[in-house]
Amino acid sequence: MQQENKQRFEDPFEHSIEAMRQDYAQLRGVYAAAIREINARLQTLDSDFSYRNRHNPIHHLESRVKSLTSICKKLKASGAPVSMSSAKKNLHDIAGVRVVCRYVDDIFRIANLLLAQDDISLILKKDYIANPKPNGYRSLHIVVDVPVYMSQGKLYAPVEIQIRTVAMDFWATLEHGIRYKASGEVSQNIVDQLRECANVITETDYKMQEIFKALQQVHDADDSYQEEITPQLIQK
């Protein structure tokens, strides 16, 4: 009798949540594999560029697979159905990689090198460097389809890649912390100050890049001089 009552009053919503958990666990493996694939390609590009140009464009990489809770919240906020099939269709940032570069030029260099690969397809691009957000946020966002090889064969998974400089990352991290502490509500005065800081940091970003380029030209000139005189010294 107790068993019959249990079956009668069982919440059908619990079934959908449990099914979604199982779907998430399965799909998480695909998204995690996509992140590993992107990270491996970025590390290879950074290493090869360093060998050829004596400069590492990438400072560091960060990555994450969005949690089931975050997925559900984002789907609810957008008004989309809350299911993993809906998440696959409507969300492009379940798998995310953040590429923190040294200089602004490095951002577009890395993006172009990655997008030049035949099996990488561009889904979406948002250039917040050319067009910063109203709060001052700057970064290059691209969403790409990357192939991953699972036991059931080749699958494609979208990965959102945020590419920014160390300075942009510094501002974004602190700005997020300030807004979180203020529960998302900050005065116009603070908003203006944060935007001003973003502008100052941007100016510094470009100045640092100019300094680096100037030093690079000096080193390149020195190397050229060494290449010209070395054969003569060897002949002597």
Predicted features along the sequence, with ranges:
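Terminal, regulation- and interaction-focused segments at domain boundaries
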Residues: 94-100
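Charged, low-complexity, helix/coiled-coil-prone segments
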Residues: 8-19, 41-59, 84-87, 143-152
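An acidic, glycine-/histidine-flanked metal-binding catalytic module
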Residues: 2-35, 42-48, 159-236
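Short linear motifs at secondary-structure transitions and domain/linker junctions
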Residues: 12-14, 18, 36, 71-77, ...
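Short charge-dense sequence patches
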Residues: 17-27, 55-65, 91-93, 150-162, ...
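Short, charged low-complexity intrinsically disordered segments located at boundaries
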Residues: 65-75, 101-106, 140-147, 227-236
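Active-site acidic/histidine clusters and adjacent loop/turn architecture
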Residues: 25-71, 76-86, 93
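Long beta-strand-rich cores associated with HINT superfamily self-processing modules
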Residues: 88, 101-210
